[in-house]
């Protein structure tokens, strides 16, 4: 029996009963309307034109409008945004010859691109959020921001005050100075860490995929779509097979399932949904059947700091 067959068999077992999943899925999604603190993560591929790797202002405008509307409805909103390194790299490429980019993979080049791109990205967000009468703020962090007690305390207080001021914090990893030891490495996990730290009710991962499949649908046309995961187990984690991310991003399905583990064990629902149309954020929060939902499954023994230390 193949790994995919094993997975399908498990899906119809005690924890994933196919006959009851559709009704249970839709009934549970209705509760998303009542979630009060929402973290939204957007990946690089969702912010850029695929043909040019330059910012897609139309999609960013819709994203900001969706988040602003959530804020106006009384929700706490935190945005975790990738894209800085990709934006900075494109700026450098427009000012340097191809020969100068031979060492583009060097960590120092990536960090320089992140520094340039983060400023450009925040300037763009600031302009769009201002158009919708919203205050945005930048938070740059890494794994050590949560692992070290004082840093974690300060980070939590900063987030809390910004939310009290009706701000929308915009979070990214501090890639321009992050060291390998304390680098999270992808914003899927970073967004789950933020959701856990801030006791969020819902984490939405905007991606270039529709959700979770039994296999990579780009390679296997027989891969089956999974819309509802009431419990994240080892068989599900194995299905990711360390899939790769997009050309401009770093997160594949493996990182998304790691994020789901952090979020759900922290008592937070998580949805993976395609960002092809940014208005999907509204559909998810309204409880409609978009993307794959991972149901909150609080684990009283789960400690975020302990988990991060075990993965460092």
Please name every model-derived segment:
Residues 2-312:
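C-terminal catalytic "cap/lid" subdomain
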């Amino acid at each position: 029996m193949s790994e995919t067959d094993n997975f399908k068999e498990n899906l119809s077992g005690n924890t994933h009963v196919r006959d009851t999943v559709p009704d249970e899925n839709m009934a549970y999604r209705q509760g998303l309307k009542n979630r009060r603190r929402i973290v939204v993560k957007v990946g690089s591929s969702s912010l850029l034109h695929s043909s040019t790797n330059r910012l897609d202002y139309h999609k960013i405008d819709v994203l900001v409008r969706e988040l602003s509307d959530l804020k106006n409805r009384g929700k706490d909103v935190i945005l975790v945004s990738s894209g800085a390194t990709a934006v900075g790299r494109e700026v450098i490429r427009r000012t340097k010859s191809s020969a100068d980019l031979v060492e583009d993979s060097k960590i120092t080049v990536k960090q320089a691109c992140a520094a340039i791109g983060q400023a450009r990205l925040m300037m763009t967000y600031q302009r769009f959020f201002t158009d919708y009468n919203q205050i945005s703020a930048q938070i740059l962090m890494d794994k050590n921001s949560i692992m070290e007690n004082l840093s974690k305390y300060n980070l939590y207080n900063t987030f809390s005050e910004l939310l009290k001021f009706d701000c929308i914090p915009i979070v990214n990893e501090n890639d321009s100075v992050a060291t390998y030891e304390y680098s999270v490495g992808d914003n899927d996990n970073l967004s789950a860490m933020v959701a856990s730290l801030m006791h969020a009710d819902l984490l939405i991962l905007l991606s270039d995929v529709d959700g979770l499949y039994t296999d990579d649908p780009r390679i296997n046309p027989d891969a089956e779509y999974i819309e509802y995961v009431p419990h994240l187990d080892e068989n599900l984690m194995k299905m990711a097979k360390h899939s790769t991310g997009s050309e401009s991003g770093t997160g594949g399905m493996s990182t998304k399932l790691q994020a789901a583990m952090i979020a759900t064990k922290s008592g937070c629902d998580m949805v993976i949904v395609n960002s092809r149309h940014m208005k999907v954020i509204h559909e998810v929060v309204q409880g409609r059947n978009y993307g794959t939902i991972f149901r909150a499954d609080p684990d009283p023994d789960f400690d975020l700091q302990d988990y991060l230390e075990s993965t460092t």
